[in-house]
Amino acid sequence: TVSVVAGSTVSSSVGSPAAFPADCNGETTAVYDVGNNKTVIFWMGASNAGKCVVATVASNNTVSVGSVVEFEDGSVDSDIAATYHAAAGKIVVVFRDNGNSGYAKARVGTVSGTSISFGTVVTFYNGDSSRKANVVYSSAAEKVVVVYSNDSTSDGFSKVGTVSGTDISFGSQATFESGAVGGNEIGMAYDSNADRVILSYRDQNNSGYGTAIVGTISGTSISFGTKAVFKSATTSGLSSVYDSVAQKVLLSYLSTGTEAIVGTVSGTSITFGASATVKSSGTGTASTVYD
């Protein structure tokens, strides 16, 4: 189960804010590069170009940012996802290219100092992908897993990606849901203890219920177990994170309010405890992070 603690005041010193590019047209996505001790921030900029910047946190808690780099000069969607590939020491970013029929694409980024450079753009889905593309890293397989859906059919798909140098290639496509992926988000978390990928989404064929499914990586392929309902009501704003100490997955979502629930993975299945209400009302997107 999960419980909600009372809010607390941040006791550590807070540094001064850093100037950030003003052309952000949507949400930002940040990913931490462990090897370089840097944070890369992605966003949709002017003319809907995909942009990013490398941020450095100093010992006195001040933040500095490098020069803006475009990873896609066409037209991206505001929902950009990224993860850190620990074995390769690279950043993998996935996005929807609205300037190319909504295809789902990926690039490998290399951080050097206060800048980042990218390898060749790779299309991993040449169909009308929705805004649900997401990505996680599997430390056991040393692969990334991407998920996405078709904007017209609402089919949900997944692929395993292999990073080599500054390039990425993908294995065969697996379907985790047929004609039922609703909303604008697919939550993803990697359970390092079970070596499993957990997806959470809104099942349009089942009254919009919050649903989760467990994926197993084998080589360059992924397969899925039986889906499980974690909320018998319409959900949205899905997000998830893995707690390495408790060895559990925490899902957050919006229903009548903002809620959270803990999942336990066993084999190719997942079970859930009782949910907790974080906020009784409100709309938007829930977000989770492990401290």
Q: Language-model features: where?
A:
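Extracellular, repeat-based ectodomains that mediate carbohydrate processing or recognition
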Residues: 1-291
